[in-house]
């Protein structure tokens, strides 16, 4: 049975929040839900992301901190009780991923300006990417321009190491091991484990 519902209808949700991209203002299907503590986050296919109060079901705020921000992914970081948003921007032709970490208590108080940009030294233009590994408390980024993979600590976002090898095609992280999958060479194994 239905336990509750959340609504981002314009009458309730968009008043006082300016989003210049018209598609952010239209209803679209929910592609991701993250819930922790007293907050529920709903990310729409359009890129609009709303935070709701679990207690009241009411809209707390939209997480789109900039008017042209399209949020593509959410990650709850239990290491520091924050929500990481991965976004693209119209002003950049939606080309570069930008990450921001905002403490949940700041979101509850509608203080989105307390969010901190992450991985600002990285150029995460497509086909670059960022992946979050909750089990190992690691973040993997790929800077496609420089062909560099970097691993960061999820606790404090410091860089742990980087891998510069044009033959790496994929990286898998498991507890205590990192698997590098390389382009196959003649008479050489196609993978290394670190």
Tell where the protein language model's regions lie, with residue ranges.
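A structural motif specific to WD40 beta-propellers
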Residues: 18-21, 60-62, 116-118, 158-161
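Intrinsically disordered, low-complexity acidic/Ser/Thr/Pro-rich linker and tail segments
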Residues: 1-56, 87-89, 93-116, 183
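Hydrophobic/aromatic beta-strand positions that recur at structurally equivalent sites within the blades
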Residues: 52-54, 76, 95-102, 132, ...
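Blade-loop segments of beta-propeller domains
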Residues: 58-83, 88
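WD40 beta-propeller blade core
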Residues: 50, 61, 93-98, 149-150, ...
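WD40 beta-propeller repeat blades
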Residues: 142-194
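Canonical WD40 repeat/beta-propeller blade segments in eukaryotic WD-repeat proteins
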Residues: 19-33, 68-76, 118-132, 166-176, ...
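Conserved beta-strand element within WD40/beta-propeller blades
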Residues: 32-34, 40-44, 83-92, 132, ...
């Amino acid at each position: 049975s239905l336990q509750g519902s959340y609504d981002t209808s314009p009458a309730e949700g968009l008043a006082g929040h300016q989003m210049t991209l018209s598609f952010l203002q239209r209803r679209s299907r929910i592609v991701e839900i993250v819930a922790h503590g007293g907050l529920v986050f709903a990310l729409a296919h359009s890129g609009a992301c709303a935070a709701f109060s679990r207690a009241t079901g009411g809209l707390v705020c939209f997480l789109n901190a900039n008017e042209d921000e399209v949020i593509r992914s959410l990650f709850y970081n239990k290491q520091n009780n924050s929500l990481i948003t991965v976004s693209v921007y119209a002003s950049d032709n939606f080309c570069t991923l930008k990450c921001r970490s905002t403490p949940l208590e700041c979101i509850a108080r509608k203080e989105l300006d307390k969010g901190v940009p992450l991985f600002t030294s990285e150029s995460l233009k497509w086909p670059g990417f960022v992946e979050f590994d909750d089990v190992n408390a690691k973040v993997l980024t790929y800077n496609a321009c420089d062909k560099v993979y970097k691993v960061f600590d999820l606790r404090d976002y410091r860089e742990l190491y980087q891998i510069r090898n044009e033959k790496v095609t994929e990286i898998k992280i498991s507890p205590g091991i990192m698997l590098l999958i390389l382009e196959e060479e003649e008479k050489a194994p196609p993978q290394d484990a670190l």
